[in-house]
Design a protein with these regions (language model features):
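Short, internal strand/loop/helix patches
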Residues: 93-139
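Short, acidic, Ser/Thr-enriched surface-loop or helix-capping motifs
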Residues: 24-25, 146
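Short active-site neighborhood of thiol/selenol oxidoreductases, capturing the structured segment around
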Residues: 32-56, 60
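Thiol-based oxidoreductase modules, predominantly thioredoxin-like and allied folds used
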Residues: 74-87, 102-111
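Short loop/turn microsegments at loop-to-beta-strand junctions
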Residues: 17-18, 39-40, 139-141
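Thiol-/selenol-based redox modules, centered on thioredoxin-like
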Residues: 130-172
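N-terminal targeting signals for export/organelle localization
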Residues: 1-19, 23, 171
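Conserved helix-turn-beta segment immediately C-terminal to the redox Cys motif
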Residues: 38-39, 55-80
């Protein structure tokens, strides 16, 4: 059974995550240990996304900026790429550092990405029949991970900065 805040669903019993291994935009290892000791907002997207991904990352960045005086510790904002063929760490670094605040990017093999997406109910599929400028269909949910690296809550789309500002202080 889970309880629902105004714009997110909080799990009564957070679900521990299993191991996965990705590479962060700065070249360091990004794994389950990277999610411990600090709350994290995970979003799965890709750098060539024309709309949902940049908008969601902007909304998360703006929410964190607004929450600076309202919460003791701001959550990390992490974009996991669902397009590892094009999203190298260098490209991902340029992309995530263009947003306000400390946005982290991570990428890896499809198998490792699926280890994480499978645990969180995130779907993604590349439309590679479109040529080199293909799109990637993906879930737009934002997942809140607690300090124990457990799936704690989900923000379902559509998102707005205000939704994150209203619900995050109630949860963190």
């Amino acid at each position: 059974m889970s309880k629902k805040t105004e714009f997110s669903t909080v799990l009564d019993d957070p679900i521990p995550l299993s191991e996965f291994s990705l590479t962060a935009n700065n070249g360091s290892i990004f794994n389950i240990e990277s999610l411990k000791e600090k709350w994290s907002l995970l979003f799965f997207g890709y750098t060539n996304c024309p709309d949902v991904c940049p908008l969601t990352l902007h909304q998360l960045s703006q929410a964190n900026k607004e929450l600076e005086s309202k919460v003791e510790h701001l959550p990390n904002i992490i974009m996991i790429s669902v397009d590892p063929d094009r999203d190298t760490t260098k490209i991902l670094d340029k992309y995530v550092t263009s947003f306000t605040g400390n946005v982290i990017g991570a990428t890896g093999s499809i198998a490792e990405i699926k280890k994480l997406t499978g645990q969180l109910g995130i779907f993604f599929e590349a439309n590679k029949g479109e040529g080199k400028n293909y799109s990637v269909n993906h879930s737009a949910a934002v997942i809140l991970i607690n300090k124990k690296a457990e799936f704690h809550a989900v923000f379902s789309a559509p998102h707005s900065t205000d939704h994150f500002i209203k619900d995050l202080p109630k949860i963190l």
